[in-house]
């Protein structure tokens, strides 16, 4: 039983993750002016505009 206890302790990892919820991304801030928007509207950001 001692070998089993040592094996369990070997894989007993106490991991705490402190993550903050944020909407930050490399694309922020989004363009608010329609002058700089690309033509087209879609749900994706590639070659489409989020300004629509």
From Swiss-Prot:
Source organism of the structure: Staphylococcus gallinarum
UniProt keyword terms in alphabetical order: Antibiotic, Antimicrobial, Bacteriocin, D-amino acid, Lantibiotic, Thioether bond
Membership in a protein family: Belongs to the type A lantibiotic family.
Name assigned to this protein: Lantibiotic gallidermin
Superkingdom of origin: Bacteria
Record GO biological process: defense response to bacterium; killing of cells of another organism
Protein role: Lanthionine-containing peptide antibiotic (lantibiotic) active on Gram-positive bacteria. The bactericidal activity of lantibiotics is based on depolarization of energized bacterial cytoplasmic membranes, initiated by the formation of aqueous transmembrane pores.
Family annotation (InterPro entries): Lantibiotic_typ-A_Bacillales
PTM annotation: Maturation of lantibiotics involves the enzymatic conversion of Thr, and Ser into dehydrated AA and the formation of thioether bonds with cysteine. The C-terminal lanthionine undergoes decarboxylation. This is followed by membrane translocation and cleavage of the modified precursor.
UniProt keyword Ligase present: no
Cellular component per GO, a single term: extracellular region
One Pfam family this sequence matches: Gallidermin
Residue location of crosslink Lanthionine (Ser-Cys): 33-37, 46-51
Cross-link position per record: S-(2-aminovinyl)-D-cysteine (Ser-Cys): 49-52
Propeptide stretch(es), residue numbers: 1-30
Linked residues for Beta-methyllanthionine (Thr-Cys): 38-41
Gene Ontology MF terms in the entry: signaling receptor binding
Key word Zinc present: no
Residues bearing the modification (Z)-2,3-didehydrobutyrine: 44
GN (gene name): gdmA
């Amino acid at each position: 039983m001692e070998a089993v206890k040592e094996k369990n302790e070997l894989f007993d990892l106490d991991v705490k993750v402190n993550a903050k919820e944020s909407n930050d991304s490399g694309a922020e801030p989004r363009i608010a002016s329609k002058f700089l928007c690309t033509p087209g509207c879609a749900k994706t950001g590639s070659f489409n505009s989020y300004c629509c």
